[in-house]
Amino acid sequence: MDETALPITEHLTELRGRLAWVLGAIVVGAGLSFNFAEQIFGFLLAPATAALAENGGKLQAIAPTEIFFTYIKCALLSGFVLTLPVTFWQMWSFIAPGLYDSERKAILPFVISSTGLFAGGAIFGYSTVFPIVFDFFNSWDNEWVVSAWTMKEVFSLTTRLFLAFGVAFELPLFVFFLSITGIVTAKQLFAGTPYAVLIIFVVGAMLTPPDPVSQLFLAIPMVLLYLAGATVAWIFDPERRAAKEAAAEKNVAKSD
């Protein structure tokens, strides 16, 4: 930990400079991504376009500016993702001087695990859930109604689902953090499972569109992830490990 204390104004000046670097990197990344916005858009919305293609349909733009501004949003999203290393580096450079060595060592595993879980959730949603969700929506076509999905709305829905599944997969890390900090114990986590399930379904309803299919496909993995997090918390439970070590020492003392 750096013992040199800086005035609050210097901290704010440094923070402003680092935010400028992050925003500049995002703008550059978005500018480069705009050249490939059509390809990026096509990849992100492949599950939706595949569902529409089954009935011979395709995405529509109902406003003169819709295609252009949707591609800009797509480029900004891509620029944000591509420049995440710059964002993390600037965050680290800002907070590292105020951390102890033990805290610095814990940051890297935390960043790696949280990034991996978020990416895993996004990939799971994209590859497994998105096709089912869009097929479900498209299945309501009939002789009186034909689906006419706009690219703006489908892009918005897709990004919301990406965010929902990415955040949902952070649940084991959050549960583990609560355990190792002593806020809750593994026993309390397992005992509170019914309440956790209720909260998960409420959160799932808030993060997803108002249909039961996408809510279920988000809530069920979240319940499993909660139980996985509680299991990991049980394995690393400080009280359990301390009791186990005390019992081992007692057995050694008896054998002597």
Where are these regions (language model features)?
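Membrane topogenic/interface segments and analogous intrinsically disordered interaction regions
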Residues: 1-256
